[in-house]
Design a protein with these regions (language model features):
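Extended substrate/RNA-proximal surfaces in nucleic-acid metabolism proteins
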Residues: 58-156
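An N-terminally biased module of ancient metal coordination in phosphate/nucleic-acid-related enzymes
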Residues: 1-82
Length: 156
């Protein structure tokens, strides 16, 4: 029996490690394509691809190049009618100075103002909170906290 996916609500996966070989997601193009097809069958029509960006390991330019190459590898097997639309972004590991780092503007979700930020799990100092606010008010981005369940219980 086939499932009629047209009657499912349109779902958006807002945090996915779907690009092959980028981080802890699929290792191969085949695995990534199978995951995309499965997501589509479950009603997912849009995926925010949020590969890890660790500023202590690489600069934004090299990350963007790696991400573009990984996304390019998916194109050969891509079947748009059976797969969700992918919006490229990043899961940016917080670093002090984030609120003044203009290159992170290139790591937003699909060119939107939304920046997925992985915050430290320990209690945040006032300086860290101020820095996160600068992401909003200096860079003009809207930070979204990734894995809030890991860090918000530690906050006052």
């Amino acid at each position: 029996m086939t499932q009629n996916t047209e009657k499912l609500p349109e779902l958006i996966d807002v945090h996915s490690h779907i690009l092959p070989g980028m981080d802890d997601g699929p290792k191969t193009v085949g695995e990534a394509l199978a995951m995309l097809e499965a997501a589509y069958r479950q009603g997912v029509r849009r995926i925010w691809s949020t590969s890890h960006f660790y500023p202590q390991k690489e600069d934004p330019a090299s990350f963007l190049k790696r991400r573009a190459e990984a996304a390019g590898r998916l194109k050969d097997g891509w079947r748009a009618s059976l797969m969700p639309k992918i919006y490229l972004g990043a899961e940016v590991a917080y670093f002090f100075g984030l609120g003044r780092c203009k290159p992170v503007c290139d790591l937003t979700i699909g060119g939107s103002p939304f920046l997925l930020v992985e915050m430290p799990p320990e209690r945040w100092s006032d300086d860290v909170v101020d820095d996160l606010l600068m992401v909003r008010y200096v860079l003009g981005l809207r930070p979204i906290i990734a894995h809030e369940e890991r860090c918000l219980p530690e906050q006052p």
